[in-house]
Amino acid sequence: MSVETKEISQTAMALVLGIQHQVKYYLSKVHVSDNDFEKYKGKTLPELKNEKYIFKTYPFTKFTKKGGKDICGQKDNEMTTPKEVGEYVAKEYSPMAFAIVRRFFGLTPESMIESICGEGNLTPPNLGSGKSGSLFMFTKDHKFVIKVIPKREEKILCKIFPLYFSYIQENPQTLIPRFYGMFRIKPQKDEEYRYVVMNNLFPNDNFPLQYKFDLKGSMYGRKANEKERNKKSPCFKDLDFVEQKAEIHIGPKLLQPFKEQVEKDSGLMAKMHLIDYSMLVGVHNLTEEELEVACKRLGIEVNKTKKEKVIENDKERKRDEKEEAKDQIINTNDNIIGEPAQKHDESGSNETEEKESKQEESK
């Protein structure tokens, strides 16, 4: 390992530990009462503009090896940092609003802390490898994604968050990412990271994905490169989707709600003046048993009929082959038995003709 790689690994590990420490601290401190949850749940955007309290972001908090003082000036030993991290400063954006979002989606602080903050629960990022300044870390249980974002994306999220907050409560089945928290951390003097905690779109490890499609509805430059294709679970793009003649089958029960939700989500993106977004589609090749269960669950009768037809045709083919084999045996037996009989008849008639001719000659 080179010195540079070693330094990057140490920095990445320090970042992971800092994030875990920060998330645990903030999530355990922010509590949403039943009254607050009912008060702000379902608020429209105009109503939320008068409730700036829930979108308030507090100043940076300093975490040291000896602990520190919280935002109320009280001594807090939980602010003592891990020895691998050292001193750092951090902040959480709109803690009350994000706490309401988490509760709205059925998350508790304890469940998130358990997934994110345990030892070895977060994969260290490959610093410097992210496109457009973005990096991803996944929790070991596949429930959450931590995305390190550039400053410009942080500004956009801060700007659109009130609209997002209102929209997800009106559309709980939305397909857009679920943002559970946004933070900033500065573990060293010359480094600063902004990150969001999101839901993992493909959390179930029982259904491993053979490949994924990142679809934008555009064809220009939308083809996976060789490096991406060689990955264990490659992510293909629009041109690959067309070239592979891929299809997405949605059952009749889900098709109309799905289309309506996509239209609503696209309308939200337009309202937010966002154009760089895509639909991520995961593909898992079903086994025969999984296919039967999926067809029943989604109400897809077409695939089931096709499957039955295949089985029926296979049975008919085997039955026809069996009948054909029987016919061949019968024909063969006819040939073996019938031909000598024919010869016998012919020889018998010849003998009769010879006797009759001899009798005529004697006369």
Show which residues each predicted segment covers.
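Polybasic, positively charged surfaces/segments
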Residues: M1-K363
